[in-house]
């Protein structure tokens, strides 16, 4: 990353685009604590977390990865995964399993996914489809209303119908809880459709930032022209990396 200066207001939903090697994943890993910056600092809700290890930083952060197999424990049941996510920010883990009220809360939460998972609490997560696991991962990441939600190409590995389902669910959950969110995507149309801010990265830098009303007027064609104007080169060479569907 090179001279990154990014400030998010509470409730901002920022979509991030850029071809492979632009620095998108590095940005996410810096925020989450997987990587540490050589210079500069990272603050979450005015708290300096720059040297805070990833496992401690996770109390502030929810993250969903591209791989549906990540983010859940496949050998555990849906209920056990939800209990684990629910207790993430608690001072002590659940000791006596899940009580009746907690189970009912889990069921009501799962109903919002519209996948009938509320009737499969005892099913092993490893038996779920990719779309079901990604929906569960998204729910788990937002359970405790994190200070910031990181979505790292979380629909890229799904078929089109499941990707649309997860996209719609993302919008619903983020809007419902007004979650401050950063979403990396290769799908330019998705980047335009979601969020109130958009940033474009290239070679480790933020080369374009668009906010609010200006973002609503953007089209894929305008984005590509803006890149060419800034960098003096075309994005067409990246058409296999940046989906326009």
Which sequence ranges carry the predicted segments?
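Conserved ABC transporter NBD signature motif
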Residues: 40-48, 208-210
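Q-loop/switch helix immediately C-terminal to the Walker
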Residues: 76-90
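Helix-to-loop junction immediately C-terminal to a conserved catalytic motif
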Residues: 32
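The feature captures the beta-strand-to-loop junction immediately N-terminal to the Walker
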Residues: 17-19
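ABC ATPase C-loop
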Residues: 141-142
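Conserved beta-strand-loop-alpha-helix hinge in the C-terminal portion
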Residues: 205-231
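H-loop/switch region of ABC-family ATPase nucleotide-binding domains
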Residues: 185-186
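ABC ATPase NBD coupling module
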Residues: 48-62, 70, 92-95, 99, ...
């Amino acid at each position: 990353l090179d001279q990154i200066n990014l400030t998010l207001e509470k409730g901002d939903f920022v979509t991030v685009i850029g071809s492979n090697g632009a620095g998108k994943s590095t940005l996410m890993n810096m925020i989450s604590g997987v990587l540490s910056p050589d210079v500069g600092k990272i603050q979450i809700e005015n708290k300096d977390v720059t040297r805070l290890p990833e496992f401690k930083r996770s109390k502030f952060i929810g993250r969903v990865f591209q791989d549906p197999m990540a983010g859940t424990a496949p050998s555990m049941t849906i209920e056990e995964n939800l209990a684990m996510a629910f207790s993430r920010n608690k001072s002590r883990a659940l000791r006596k399993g899940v009580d009746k009220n907690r189970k009912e809360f889990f069921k009501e939460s799962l109903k919002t996914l519209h996948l009938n998972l509320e009737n499969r609490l005892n099913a092993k997560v490893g038996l779920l489809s990719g779309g079901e696991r990604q929906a569960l991962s998204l729910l788990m990441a937002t359970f405790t209303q994190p200070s910031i939600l990181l979505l790292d190409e979380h629909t890229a590995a799904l078929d089109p119908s499941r990707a649309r389902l997860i996209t719609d669910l993302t919008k619903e959950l983020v809007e419902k809880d007004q979650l401050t969110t950063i979403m990396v995507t290769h799908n330019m149309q998705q980047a335009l459709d979601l969020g109130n801010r958009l940033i474009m990265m290239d070679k480790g830098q933020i080369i374009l930032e668009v906010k609010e009303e200006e973002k609503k007027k953007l089209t894929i064609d305008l984005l590509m022209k803006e890149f060419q104007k800034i960098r003096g080169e075309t994005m067409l060479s990246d058409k296999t990396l940046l989906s326009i569907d």
